[in-house]
Amino acid sequence: MKTIFEALKWASSYLTEAGREENAAELLLLYDTGMERSKLLASLQEPIGEDELYRFKRHVEMHKEGVPVQYIIGKEFFYGREFMVNDDVLIPRPETEEVVFHLLEKYRSVFSEDGKLEVVDVGTGSGAIAVTLALENQSFSVSAVDISKEALQVASANAEKLGANVRFYQGDLLEPFIKAGKKADIIVSNPPYISEEEMADLSEIVRFHEPLHALTDGGDGLKFYKRFMEDIPLVMKDKVFVVFEIGWKQGAAVKDLILKAFKGAEVEVLKDINGKDRTICALIHKNK
């Protein structure tokens, strides 16, 4: 194995046989050589350094054993930006990009007036949602909450690296806002919604390596949505726009929770690119 091409060919075959994604080999090789993709492709017949090959083999073996590529290389792209990730946070996913897209598209029909809007991202993890919203819309005053101190360190680092103005709070769901007497115009959350039953269906890469507390509530997957129904009235203004990421089987159940908790709420269930329920948007009025 003397050339970059031979190293890439070996790793692609090795990982495919192990049931991993073939393109993982290229991502790891880019990381271990420090090359841009165009440079890598132009250098396929060049020799690979001994140190680079050693690191590459070690990282390929790690991924074969189930460690996500994103945790090995320490990053993932979200909404066109590079976010730092480690095993203290979930890896940002395309489905969550769709949640952000829907929020940015639909909030205008709710808030026609000018001025700052108070946005709270609950369970921020890597900060992908909060940072993206702060950068995509200057009228948003963004706060982010997480119960994990380690996750908040990652989120804060991402905000600083990307130049996003986000205020971070450690606490359980909306608890920091409730205690501080703060109010929100928009609440967004991608809570742990995978049911205990569905956990068995996840790939071992996700199940054994991403933070369990950020994936599942250990029950039916609805625990945190139910808690939101109790907390939202304590932080909302005259109206609040709520956007949740949901499991693909949870659309009807979460919609029903909202309608039972808030009379007159306007609730929409939106599908993701795969045609599965993924986002709930709800406009809730205080006096209805």
From Swiss-Prot:
Gene3D superfamilies: DNA helicase RuvA subunit, C-terminal domain, Vaccinia Virus protein VP39
Gene Ontology terms, MF aspect: nucleic acid binding; protein-(glutamine-N5) methyltransferase activity; protein-glutamine N-methyltransferase activity
Binding site for S-adenosyl-L-methionine: 123-127, 146, 190
Catalytic activity: L-glutaminyl-[peptide chain release factor] + S-adenosyl-L-methionine = N(5)-methyl-L-glutaminyl-[peptide chain release factor] + S-adenosyl-L-homocysteine + H(+)
Binding site residues for substrate: 190-193
Pfam families xrefs: MTS, PrmC_N
Biological process, per Gene Ontology: methylation; translational termination
Domain of life: Bacteria
Family label: Belongs to the protein N5-glutamine methyltransferase family. PrmC subfamily.
Protein name according to UniProt: Release factor glutamine methyltransferase
Organism: Bacillus subtilis (strain 168)
Name of the gene encoding the protein in the UniProt record: prmC
